[in-house]
Each structure stands twice: as C-alpha cells, then as structure tokens.
C-alpha cells in the first residue's frame, strides 16, 4: 500500500459511532414520533362555509391511490441506494475512474490492522447522507403539516360539519371553530395534513439527489444522451408524482409546489455543501512551486516603452554594426 495515499486517523471511528450515528438515530426517532404517534398535535384550522376548494370528492384511502404510498416510499429509498452502490463499484472496477477515485480519496488507517478503503468510505458517505436527508425531509414535511393544519381539497366531504347553531348560509362566512366534524376522525385528521405534500417532497428529493450524483460522478465518453435521459426520467417521475396528487384531489397545487421546493432544497444543500458535489474529501492537486512574495510592492503597473527609447536603441544597434564591419580582418590564412 502506497504510503502517500494513506492517512492515519484514530478519531474517525469514534466520531462515526458517537457523533454521526447518534445524530442519525435521533433523526430517525424524531421522524418516527411524527409518523407513528400523536405526540405532536395538529393545528385545528377553520374554514369557510361550503368552500368550493374543500368540496372535492373524497378519493378514498391512500392505499387506493394510483401511486400507493408504500410502493413510493420503497422506491424513493431503494432506487437511489442501488444506483449509488452500483455506480461506486463500477467506477472502482474501471481502471481510469478507479485511479481517479484513489487520487481523490485516501485510505484511512485506524489501527495496526484496520483500514478504510476509499470505496467503502464513499459508499457509506453518499448513502448515509442520502438516508439522513430522506428522514430530514420527512421531518420537515410533518412539521409543516402539524403546524399549519392545512385542509385537503376533500376536507368538507369527510368532515361532514355540524352546522347546527351556526348561521352558515353564505359561502363567505368563516367558521373559526374547525372542530365541528362528525365524520371519521382518522380520515378527518388525515385531511388536515395537506401542506406540504409528502409524496412530492420525498420523490423530488430522491430524484434531485440521484441526478446530482449521476452528473457529478459517472463519466461516459461513448454516449452523450445516456445521463441526460436517465436524469430527466427521474425528475419526470417525481413531477408526475406531484401531478397525480393534484389530479386525485389529495393535495392542492400549492401543496405540491411547496413539496417540490422543500425536497429539492434539501437535496441541493446536502449535495453541494455536505458531500461537496460528490467529490473526494482529500483531493491531491499537483504541487506547485511556492513563490515568496515578501518584499514585492503592493501594486505594479506595466512598463510602456516610449517611441524615443525605441529609436535610440535602434540607432545604437546600427552604430555597433557599422563599427564591427569597418574593422580590418586581422586573421591571416
């Protein structure tokens, strides 16, 4: 093993175990509390009488959707993981990209017999950051839904509000007490969590993250259209997922747009600021000669030679030529 491509570090394993894994566990735990418990109560939002935007037909449970949530969540989690895993192994096997990878990444020596290969480091880093961002996106979405309590387009059909005692004869009358529903409480609670769209956020986060990975790491010399087609296909799938939510009256258009902005923002932040555009953390640029700038002036201006100086120099050159040619030849045969 080349000594110039290794780096000894005894802190990387403890930092990974006691810092990064703890942060990851806390993120997963917070996402679990948002998803599976009622620890965080939903804001009860009022509504207008017979609001046309809330009178859309009930599309049925989420499991009856054209894009079922369980399948969507499995795809947005498994597809990027598989692409990153296969991509890193393929680049490591190929000679040209493998040498470039070794030039960017150093093998970490953590003990007398323990080494962290650059391939393992990159796979753990890219997939780990992706998983963290996926749970973070879920937390942001759930927090927004709990805080706003925005109503779904089908809210009034499942709420079945009890208008008894309320003078609700005009559609412009606002009912501040939004807790007058007589319908199924589980369905009503789900209808209060519309903003932002979770499916749109998770799908666009996954698509943008993988698109950044493909465009930044995978190099193809034989085909110019393979990467664009793959990346645009992923982005199109995420876009169609959001449109499906609107077409089935499960989310408002603004909910889907907010989900797109949230998911893409998190993916861009992690891809650019955290994993450095999927480049190596220990790049080895060519060493250049260090120049000593001490003693030089703070500012220098280009020297412009005047015409008089040019003519004077030419005159001196001509005189020297004439003197040389006028001297007799002192060499004899």
Swiss-Prot record:
Keywords of the record: Cell membrane, Cell projection, Glycoprotein, Membrane, Transmembrane, Transmembrane helix
Major localization class: membrane
One Gene Ontology cellular component: plasma membrane
Domain of life per record: Eukaryota
Alphabetical list of SMART domains matching this protein: acidPPc (SM00014)
Glycosylation site residues: 162
One GO MF term: phosphatidate phosphatase activity
Membrane topology label: Multi-pass membrane protein
Intracellular or extracellular location(s): Cell membrane; Cell projection, Neuron projection
Transmembrane portions of the chain: 12-32, 66-86, 126-146, 200-217, 223-243, 256-276
Record GO biological process: nervous system development; phospholipid dephosphorylation; phospholipid metabolic process; signal transduction
UniProt key word Membrane: yes
Family label: Belongs to the PA-phosphatase related phosphoesterase family.
Function statement: May play a role in neurite outgrowth and neurogenesis.
Identification of the protein by name: Phospholipid phosphatase-related protein type 1
Originating species: Danio rerio
